[in-house]
Amino acid sequence: TCLAHKQQAVNRLLYRIYSPIXXXF
């Protein structure tokens, strides 16, 4: 569905933002 595709895009964006932070710790 369109909603699922949007959710996937949001999850990928959040991962891209929080990945360096997680990493950092």
Swiss-Prot record:
GO biological process, one term: oxygen transport
A GO molecular function held by the record: oxygen carrier activity
Entry annotated with the keyword Nucleotide-binding: no
Tissue and organ expression note: Hemolymph.
GO cellular component: extracellular region
Main location (coarse class): secreted
Source organism superkingdom: Eukaryota
Location of this chain's protein in the cell: Secreted, Extracellular space
Alphabetized UniProt keyword annotations: Copper, Oxygen transport, Secreted, Transport
Family, similarity comment: Belongs to the tyrosinase family. Hemocyanin subfamily.
Primary role: Hemocyanins are copper-containing oxygen carriers occurring freely dissolved in the hemolymph of many mollusks and arthropods.
Protein's name in the database: Hemocyanin subunit 2
Source organism of the structure: Carcinus maenas (Common shore crab)
